[in-house]
Amino acid sequence: MSRTTTTTIAIVGAGRVGRALARSLRAHGWNIGAVVTRSAATARSAVRAIGGGHPHGVLTRRVLDAGVILIATPDDCIRDVAVKLARAGGEEWRGKVVLHTSGALDDRALKPLAHLGAATGAMHPLQTFSGRGVPLLEGVAFVIQGHGRARQEARRIARTLGGAPVALRRAAKPAYHAAGTFAAPYFLTLVETATRILVRIGFSRRRARAVLLPLIRQTLANYERFGARKAWTGPVARGDFSTVARHRAALAEWPEEFS
């Protein structure tokens, strides 16, 4: 009799995203199987953070004890992981569901496993994972690409975690991921630039952050309530280009901050 169950999930790559999803799934009743990272020490650390699972410092056939395998490695590693897993499992992959968490890559990154009969797909939670605490997943979009059972399992995971599954076609994934990058890390780049400007004119970093946070919060609240166009303020929105020229002249004194 097979030990496989679709409520047991193996995690390959237990960094910020892998740990957060595994911990949340465990809290919702899923069994955590093999947890695979690059070393035994990090695997044990991940299992402690997740609150369950079996640590492995190398790729192992034990992932096949799960019905669902989640690959949460960096994007550049996903194809290599798929190749190694295919070699390890052979025909035992038939009927398994394998998902990766990349926002930019589609299910073709898992082609070696698909060729062996696994149902493959991508499931990307559109959320930021800082590694501190468990991120809020309630209401978060889980962007899903794949077919058949892979898409069904991805939807089930998203709904289990209180997320909103969103289907996306293959060709749209890179542009989708670019949008998310503009909304989070690039946004923080702008905030950091504003912080550095204030530090240049005498603020401490702590004071600069305290000064900027109310502005940032209100801007996001306005965006949530009115949308970007109606929330847009400042000299460009007013057509006050003489003020913009003064901004440019002031910032030209510190070109290294904007290179």
Each language-model region and where it sits:
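Rossmann-like NAD(P)(H) cofactor-binding subdomain of soluble oxidoreductases
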Residues: H54-G133
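NAD(P)+-binding Rossmann beta1-loop-alpha1 motif at the extreme N-terminus of oxidoreductases
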Residues: M1-R61
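Interdomain hinge/lid region at the active-site interface
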Residues: A221-S259
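Short, well-ordered alpha-helices that flank and scaffold nucleotide-derived cofactor binding pockets
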Residues: R19, R23-A27, R48, V83, ...
